[in-house]
């Protein structure tokens, strides 16, 4: 059985709806293989909830107008499509949006049962004039990907007064990825996969990635079932990159190194603290233009984080180091 470095996955949270996931080290070429598979799965196969049809009292079709309502039915349908819904109910169900009098009709005015949440409650659905009455039923279902209004119409929603809606089930808004070179031990040709995931408020990015991973495991498992004893690559334990140590994911830009030391390391392809720990002092000194003072500087910075170079004794004494070196 071939043994490979075990990749680690670290989440860098950008906001409540956006995270950056770093997976490394991956065998050469696997960054693009995994990145493309995850991106496609995230955009097309994550379950979500959406409105499939609406029924507005007194309205027979989407080209109607409603007395006392600023928006026509077509505009209301467009607003309904922007609803962000999370649902724990597997079967189709109907909710009601009822409001009277002058003012805005908001998404948070929808009467939802337990297990249903509206993620963008401030979304304006319609604007009412004085004495106007707005009474709308919304049918909500769970699904995946995108289903057109025409498809919803063909699926049995052509009853009088029922207006089908384009259903955007996917809770994932945007996914991008890039692949960089990274180091593992003495090899520098491994892949680092960086995936940027932005979701709707109905799901956390980490949950979306977990769902995509589960889906891919199920699909790839079909191939494995052909011969469960077939030889493959086994991922060993990579002691260089403990998942619990966030310090190892600190970019070298954040270490406060001198310009000379920083430039030498970047030219060598070193980007994170975890990669520095794969070097011995002599290996650093072998880098072009990287002298003893640069090596001492790096050891001092690592010691501040509680780490040391490969083969070095922890607790580097940097008391003699000149902090103005290389500036």
UniProtKB/Swiss-Prot annotation:
Classification via Gene3D superfamilies: 5' to 3' exonuclease, C-terminal subdomain (1.10.150.20), DNA-directed RNA polymerase, insert domain (2.170.120.12), RNA polymerase, RBP11-like subunit (3.30.1360.10)
Residue ranges, annotated region (Alpha C-terminal domain (alpha-CTD)): 244-327
Pfam families: RNA_pol_A_bac (PF01000), RNA_pol_A_CTD (PF03118), RNA_pol_L (PF01193)
Statement: the UniProt record of this protein carries the keyword rRNA-binding: no
Top EC class for this record: transferase
Any one biological process term the GO annotation gives: DNA-templated transcription
Region annotation (Alpha N-terminal domain (alpha-NTD)) ranges: 1-227
GO cellular component, one term: DNA-directed RNA polymerase complex
Similarity section: Belongs to the RNA polymerase alpha chain family.
Domain notes: The N-terminal domain is essential for RNAP assembly and basal transcription, whereas the C-terminal domain is involved in interaction with transcriptional regulators and with upstream promoter elements.
Function: DNA-dependent RNA polymerase catalyzes the transcription of DNA into RNA using the four ribonucleoside triphosphates as substrates.
Name of the featured protein: DNA-directed RNA polymerase subunit alpha
